[in-house]
Amino acid sequence: MARSLIIAACGAGTVGREHFLAEYGRLADRLEREGIQVALDRFSALPSRRAFRDKDPHGFQEFLAQLREHPPRAKAQILRGVLLRRKTIFELEPQLKTLQVPTLILVGDQDEPCIEPALFMQRHIPHAGLLTLPRSGHQVNLEEPALFNLHVSEFLSAVETGRWGSRTEPRT
């Protein structure tokens, strides 16, 4: 059983679900027909990826180089088998309310698809706290590694020493 949870950049596809399903379904088809560069071009153009590209061009290129190594067919299967089939964060509300472990939720303020789901999780997980990193996108751990690791370390220390308690007032 987990003693704590760290949730980062989670929930894309929760808001605007129909658009998400259609867009990623098309991307899966294109990956199989045209190869991995299709995904790289799409990822590079997303507003939620811009912060990483602008902050650390070399790191962003390294990230793309690693993605380039992924087999396109496998990537398409992951899109269809996981992303397009998973429940939205909103649909997980009953399960979120039962989580009884300290939880740190991290999101970049430019990761628009994940902001509303992050707020939702923070409101429905009893022992959750939310950290929004400024001028950061979807890869908060890669864009701001020192800041990310500092907050994760502080969270784990608070959990270990019993300083991460529950909220005093229940949320709806």
Residue ranges, per PLM feature:
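Cofactor-binding loop segments of dinucleotide-utilizing enzymes, especially the Rossmann-like FAD-
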Residues: 10, 108, 135
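Hydrophobic, aromatic-rich cap/lid helix
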Residues: 42, 61-92
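Short beta-strand/loop motif that positions the catalytic acidic residue
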Residues: 98-99, 105-107
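Catalytic active-site module of serine/aspartate enzymes centered on a nucleophile-bearing elbow/loop
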Residues: 127-172
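Conserved alpha/beta-hydrolase "acid-adjacent" motif
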Residues: 112-117
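Flexible "cap/lid" loop of the alpha/beta hydrolase fold
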Residues: 2-38
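Conserved hydrophobic packing residues within short motifs/helices of P-loop NTPase cores
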Residues: 6, 104-106, 131
